[in-house]
Amino acid sequence: MAFTKKTVRDADVEGKRVLMRVDFNVPLKDGVVTDDTRVRAAIPTIQYLKEHNAKIILMSHLGRPDGTGFQPELSLRPAAEKLAELTGFDVKFVEDTYGEKAKEAVDALQPGDILVLENVRFDKREKKNDPEIAKTLASYGDIFVLDAFGTAHRAQGSVVGPAAYLPAYAGFLLEKEVDTLTSIFADPERPFVAIVGGSKVSSKIGVLDHLIDSADTLIIGGGMAYTFFMAKGYTVGTSLKEEDWVERAGEMLKKAEAKGVKILLPVDNVVADHFGEDAKGEVVDSDKIPDDRMGMDIGPKTRELYAEAIKGAKTVFWNGPMGVFEMDQFAAGTEAVCRAVADSDCTSIIGGGDSVAAVNKFGLADKMSWISTGGGASMELVEGKALPGVEALLDA
């Protein structure tokens, strides 16, 4: 399915002020960027604009500020420094977003210059999509480019606002993300195996529903598996469960059966008596979880079962871990699935969020076909929802 919006290639950017929303929401430790994936992802569009002598104004959020003003630990300065380090470009930074200092910094730009504005969320009006915010941001540019796929599902001031006042185009990352994620579901090479993990059925109900309509096999892991176990009549001890969603999980199992879609649930689990770094794991079958134990990971038989299903796939979509992979003693299930996907001769799409963290943790990022930079945005696209940020752009 071809991308239906105009991209930066369609714009005349020569000498123009290009206001670009990027996703520099990167993890920081002691003021240093610990994972630069999102900064790297924005570079192709930035490079293109620089080569075409645009005056480039970059804006992003970082973290969850309280919206009452400057918070030094959530400043975008480290992201601006990382961009300079990765590209070798001179990157200017201004400790202001909507005020006089920002306006002066924009006015001083020459063709080819790059300026990063301070965190857009230091003002609470950003999240409310306040028109005043949008108007201020739009006043900095002649053209608006959206390349922040990770926030394209949010109707917020810096994401959709400028498009009301400026001609709005997609950046290369946004185009590639939407193209990749929509085409895989429109016409996947089969067998198509979807792997969904994570803690809650409730947060991924739309995705699961959509996958039952398009996948040949649906593999379920993580905390959500225990709600499905309850639908099958198993007891799950003190495992994470959503009792309000048991009936819905049961309906999904029936729907999959009626459609001839194979749903794979864990046959064994690694359980522990409490949730903590010092917790010790033991393996039990899925229908024999003791009352005082909680599921923390899929067990060894399940790891083999899932790896076998993945091995035969031509297309794999993966979103969500198989267990508490942040703790090494409960990481084996997620690692096994990750390695099976990496070793498989398939088109592999990693759907953002914790799956990306897992792929990076196990050093397998270069073995995947496409790693999405969006968690929530990927999921909404997979569900078939329109993304407000994309909708606001000019039609091709």
Predicted regions and their residues:
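Active-site loop-to-helix "anion-binding N-cap" substructures in soluble metabolic enzymes
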Residues: M1-A396
